[in-house]
């Protein structure tokens, strides 16, 4: 039987993490593999594109900037963040790059490698709320609508 995170790490041509939070960057920078996403990334030898999105103060924090440098040294690819109005209503660097910018980046990535021309292009897009189980019955969740994921899948 195949192990899920190993099979997924072999399946992808590139792995896109969008949005990439400060917490997720921190986990990657120390090699923490505690869930499907982080175990796939640690098991993969493919390029990984991270798309940071967070409050400007979180982005500029020394810990986040240190994690950014570590991840760049590991070979992770980055697009953004951009300057603009963020979800919290503040303005500054930390806004996620637009889906169009990310699509253009990926198109260029694949064009340079002739990946899409070799076979049918498939993408896995996940969207919606996340759940972190405290125990078998209770969990902490968010109210994500999945709108961002549905926009990507146009």
What positions do the PLM features span?
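A cross-family phosphate/adenosyl-ligand binding-site feature
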Residues: 1-48, 56-146, 150-154
């Amino acid at each position: 039987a195949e192990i899920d995170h190993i099979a997924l790490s072999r399946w992808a041509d590139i792995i896109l993490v969008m949005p990439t939070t400060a917490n997720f960057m921190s986990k990657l920078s120390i090699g923490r593999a505690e869930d499907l996403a982080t175990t796939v990334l640690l098991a993969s030898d493919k390029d990984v594109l991270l798309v940071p999105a967070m409050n400007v103060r979180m982005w500029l924090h020394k810990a986040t900037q240190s994690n950014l440098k570590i991840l760049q040294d590991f070979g992770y690819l980055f697009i953004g963040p951009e300057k603009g109005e963020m979800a919290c209503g503040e303005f500054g660097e930390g806004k996620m790059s637009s889906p169009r910018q990310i699509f253009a980046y990926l198109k260029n990535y694949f064009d340079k490698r002739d990946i899409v021309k070799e076979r049918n292009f498939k993408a896995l897009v996940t969207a919606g709320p996340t759940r972190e189980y405290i125990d078998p019955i209770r969990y902490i969740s968010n109210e994500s609508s999945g709108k961002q994921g549905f926009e990507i899948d146009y």
